[in-house]
């Protein structure tokens, strides 16, 4: 199993070497160890869990920052240690599927706007990360329907979409 993980990581590194030099995040099929990975912009990606070999793949593809939206009981302490040991910046803004508060969105805004790029925003599945991305885009003035579509593409599911609509679309 370790051999397979090492092989997958090396394969990912090989495929994404040109992107590392450009400072752009890779497309989804190019970052295998990160679940439900999607490219939101040239500098920002959104995903679910970072799997075995995922932190190494992030480093190899040029990522500088990880914004983790999971709660402490989802393993954030271990991930923080791995990410920081690899030389990346780590932010944790714990949130649940209960919705996004103004305080959480403010903390996210501060994190994303101060982050070194490229940046990965993630949670357990991509649902919360997609919802946070959509909420941020709405607050920044993007057309709400376009922001929600971006959130859906990143993994936001209907129950979280409704919470985003209720909280941030007036």
Segment roles from a protein language model:
Residues 19-119, 133-170:
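Cys-dependent protein tyrosine phosphatase-like superfamily
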Residues 11-13, 126, 151:
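Glycine-centered small-residue hotspots that permit tight backbone geometry or close packing
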Residues 6-18:
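Bacterial N-terminal signal peptides
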Residues 119-130:
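A phosphate-binding catalytic loop at a beta-strand-loop-alpha-helix junction
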């Amino acid at each position: 199993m370790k051999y397979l993980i090492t092989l997958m990581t090396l394969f990912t590194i090989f495929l994404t070497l040109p992107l590392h030099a450009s400072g752009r995040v890779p497309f989804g099929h190019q970052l295998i160890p990160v679940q439900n990975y999607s490219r939101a912009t040239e500098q920002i990606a959104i995903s679910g869990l970072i799997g075995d070999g995922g932190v190494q793949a992030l480093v190899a593809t040029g990522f500088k920052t990880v914004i983790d939206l999971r709660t402490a009981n989802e393993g954030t302490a271990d991930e923080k240690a791995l990410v920081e040991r690899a030389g990346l910046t780590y932010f944790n803004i714990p949130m649940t599927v209960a919705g996004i508060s103004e305080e959480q969105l403010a903390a996210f805004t501060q994190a994303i706007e101060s982050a070194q790029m490229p940046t990965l925003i993630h949670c357990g599945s991509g649902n919360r990360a997609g919802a946070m991305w959509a909420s941020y885009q709405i607050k920044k003035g993007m057309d709400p329907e376009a922001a929600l579509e971006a959130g859906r593409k990143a993994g936001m599911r209907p129950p979280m979409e409704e919470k985003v609509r209720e909280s941030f679309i007036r």
